[in-house]
Amino acid sequence: SVADKAKAIEVIDQRKDEILNEAKDTDPNGKITVEETSFDGKVLTKGLSKRFIDCLFILPNGLVKRHEGETITSSNIGILEEDDNEIRLSCMVRSQFDSAKHSIADQVLKIVENYGGKAEIKSEYPGWQREDTPLIDLSNQVWKELHGDEMIVATTHGGLECGLLKGTLSNVEMISFGPEIHGAHSPAEKAHIKSVE
């Protein structure tokens, strides 16, 4: 139970506008409500709650490194699950460079272990850096013939098949291409239909 319910409600009321404002781009219809309910389940001890929140607070979450306006490395806290015996947290670490990805993953492992948790790497996919190769020039030439303008060459901060393929086909030139997408991985995600054709 909260020792001072009125104070807890006051603090939440003071912060909710600030929190909703921060989330307005991704959750424009967000709401925060507080109501008293009965609860007869288990709760974390005060000590465990503090350790867990402190651990969450210092885990790398979000942008880690940018270069020339492009995201190079990030780490995102994703799914949080709880049952009677444990709390499970999934983090996704991504980078164009495997060394940077491994460094951040090692940091996550060490932080969790320092707070008394257990951590493991369940899966990963390799990074991939765009290379300036004749294939890019050829692709641009074909694009120009088909569409009459220059192809946009850009880097994306997502998992691409090229990273997986490059591990097996290291001498093969490759590019990744796709449609024009806005608001990726958000409720407002949109794809420009003409760019899919």
Locate each region found by the language model.
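Zn-dependent metallopeptidase/amidohydrolase metal-coordination segment
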Residues: 72-74, 78-87, 92, 142-197
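Short, contiguous acidic/charged loop-to-helix segments that flank catalytic cores in large enzymes
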Residues: 95-96, 126-130, 190
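Generic structural signal for residues in well-ordered beta-strands
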Residues: 30-36, 119, 150-153
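Generic long, charged, amphipathic alpha-helical segments
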Residues: 112-146
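C-terminal catalytic subdomain
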Residues: 87-105
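His/Asp/Glu-rich mid-to-C-terminal helical/loop segments that flank catalytic regions of hydrolases
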Residues: 9-11, 48-65, 102-110, 141, ...
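Structural signal for hydrophobic packing residues in well-ordered secondary-structure cores
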Residues: 12, 16-27, 60, 108, ...
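Midchain, well-structured core segments that form catalytic/ion-binding scaffolds
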Residues: 1-93
